[in-house]
């Protein structure tokens, strides 16, 4: 049986929906191998740690439960949905855990009359948040409030207050609410997450499964995690127990400073397995400040589609290191206006080297529209400095301007036998259409499929097979180990490095 492992955001849509995950009970043991001197120092340090009560008492009043109301139809409640998860159905009827969850079910379960009027119900989603100012600004996750029409927060003392949505930033999954009350609220400050080390203690506070004010502790497991949610991924991984409903809640260091905003977990079941992810404080602080001041986040925009530079790609273009960001498609934007083209590699921004595509995206996003930057660009085998005036990032980044082609080409097919490709001229004369691929070839391994269009080879336009073979010969003379194909698939550009076949 194959287990499905997935990332999930942590907002709980009603208490029953949040519990549609399996409960598992197990025990484990482990051994710590170390020298005596080191062990003594570690245990001595642990003995000095008197728990987290002092920190919790300091910061907990600033943490809130976020309730989101929506006009969407509420999911009907079924006892079988609620309790038939693996593990739960095996518990005795009098088991305290089963009784505990049954109490919650019965507490929130609507009556028969209200079920008959289900179209008038307004479902509630639960999440977490925290005050960052005495005048009522609250940070939470965008996915917590994204479907809402009205919002409320429950304070640590149980007081419920209405809140107003100030702004959201889906790209970083952050949002800001505001409570307008003539009182001062307890609040917390953002800390310096750059000082956070793997192995440092952290404390998470939130509203898992609607259980407000829940405190858990753990350590920093890793930094700079990319979990595939977007180009701005740069998560702090922690092993503190984090579950659905913890979304938007804070992660604190031992100084009581917010070092992260909990947003996702990695789990085979949907519940906590000790792998949670928090947005770094540095990112949250910058985004939140703009949301409060402007109601939105304005980012610098180059107007390019990019892909990673692999070792094979760097070899094919004569780049010493497999670093930077390869331009697959310059959209109609600032970069194209400055002369940046597909196949160019951005290797630095204002003199600072770029490691990868995420590095470039973050640096440009942290700049302001209208700002002029100097890009180090690897173009046609040499480095050039190009100045680009950034624009504002549009709402739709998926702008496409691809060539059209057909897979019907009669008898005009030509063969690149050494590379396992059969190609034909495209209908619009731009590139060569791949009509067949040898499944055992390097091209197939690199994901080239029939219907793809080879637009350029080593940044030179191709219209016939001889354009490719001539480029290969020139690359061999230069001692290159691979050729770089610009391939268009369904109007999306990418670059593929193919090893040069030596006869």
UniProtKB/Swiss-Prot annotation:
GO biological process, one term: proteolysis
Single GO term (MF): serine-type endopeptidase activity
Recorded catalytic activity of this chain's protein: Acts on substrates that are at least partially unfolded. The cleavage site P1 residue is normally between a pair of hydrophobic residues, such as Val-|-Val
Keywords, in A-Z order: Hydrolase, Periplasm, Protease, Repeat, Serine protease, Signal, Stress response
Signal peptide per UniProt: 1-18
Subcellular location field: Periplasm
Superkingdom of the organism of origin: Bacteria
Protein residues bound to substrate: 245-247, 302-306
Entries under PROSITE patterns matching the protein: PDZ
InterPro entries: PDZ (IPR001478), PDZ_6 (IPR041489), PDZ_sf (IPR036034), Pept_S1C_Do (IPR011782), Peptidase_S1_PA (IPR009003), Peptidase_S1C (IPR001940)
Record Pfam families: PDZ_2 (PF13180), PDZ_6 (PF17820), Trypsin_2 (PF13365)
GO CC terms: outer membrane-bounded periplasmic space
EC number per UniProt: 3.4.21.107
Leading EC class: hydrolase
Predominant localisation class: periplasm
Annotated ranges, domain PDZ: 286-357, 419-466
Catalytic machinery residues: 143, 173, 247
Name recorded for this polypeptide: Probable periplasmic serine endoprotease DegP-like
């Amino acid at each position: 049986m194959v287990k499905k492992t997935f990332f999930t955001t942590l907002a709980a849509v009603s208490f029953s929906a949040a519990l549609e995950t399996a409960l598992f009970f197990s025990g484990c043991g482990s051994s710590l191998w170390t020298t005596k001197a080191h062990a003594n120092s570690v245990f001595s340090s642990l003995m000095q740690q008197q728990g987290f009560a002092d920190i919790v008492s300091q910061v907990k009043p600033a943490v809130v439960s976020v309730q989101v109301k929506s006009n969407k139809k509420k999911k009907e409640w079924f006892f079988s949905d609620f309790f038939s998860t693996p593990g739960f159905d095996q518990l005795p009827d009098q088991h305290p855990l089963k009784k505990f969850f049954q109490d919650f079910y019965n507490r929130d379960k609507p009556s028969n009359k209200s079920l008959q009027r289900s179209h008038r119900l307004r479902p509630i989603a639960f999440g977490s948040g925290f005050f960052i100012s005495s005048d009522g600004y609250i940070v939470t996750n965008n996915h917590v409030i994204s479907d809402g029409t009205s919002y409320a927060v429950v304070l640590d003392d149980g007081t419920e207050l209405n809140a107003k949505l100030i702004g959201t930033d889906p790209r970083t999954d952050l949002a800001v609410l505001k409570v307008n009350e003539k009182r001062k609220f307890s609040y917390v400050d953002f800390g310096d997450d750059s000082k956070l080390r793997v192995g440092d203690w952290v404390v998470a506070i939130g509203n898992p499964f609607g259980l407000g004010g829940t405190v858990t502790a753990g350590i920093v497991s890793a930094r700079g995690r990319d979990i595939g949610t977007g180009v701005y991924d740069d998560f702090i991984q922690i092993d503190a127990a984090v579950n659905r409903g913890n979304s938007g809640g804070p992660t604190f260091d031992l100084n009581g400073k917010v070092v992260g905003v909990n947003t996702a977990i990695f789990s085979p079941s949907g519940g906590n397995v000790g792998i949670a992810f928090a947005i770094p404080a540095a990112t949250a602080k910058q985004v939140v400040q703009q949301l409060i001041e402007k109601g939105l986040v304005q980012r610098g925009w180059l107007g390019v589609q990019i892909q990673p530079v692999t070792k094979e790609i760097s070899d094919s273009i004569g780049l010493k290191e497999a670093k930077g960001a390869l331009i697959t498609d310059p959209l109609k934007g600032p970069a194209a206006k400055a002369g940046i083209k597909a196949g160019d590699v951005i290797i630095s921004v204002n003199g600072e080297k770029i490691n990868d595509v995420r590095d470039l995206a973050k640096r440009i996003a942290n700049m302001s529209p209208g700002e002029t930057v100097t890009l180090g660009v690897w173009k046609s085998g040499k480095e050039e400095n190009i100045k680009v005036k950034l624009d504002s990032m549009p709402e739709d980044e998926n702008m496409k301007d691809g060539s059209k082609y057909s897979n019907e080409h009669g008898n005009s097919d030509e063969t690149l036998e050494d590379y396992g490709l059969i190609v034909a001229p495209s209908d619009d004369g731009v590139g060569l259409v791949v009509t067949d691929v040898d499944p055992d070839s390097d091209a197939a391994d690199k994901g080239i499929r029939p219907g793809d269009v080879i637009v350029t080879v080593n940044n030179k336009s191709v219209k016939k097979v001889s354009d490719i073979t001539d480029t290969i010969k020139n690359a061999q003379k230069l001692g290159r180990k691979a050729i770089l194909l610009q391939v268009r698939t369904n109007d999306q550009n990418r670059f593929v490095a193919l090893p040069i076949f030596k006869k």
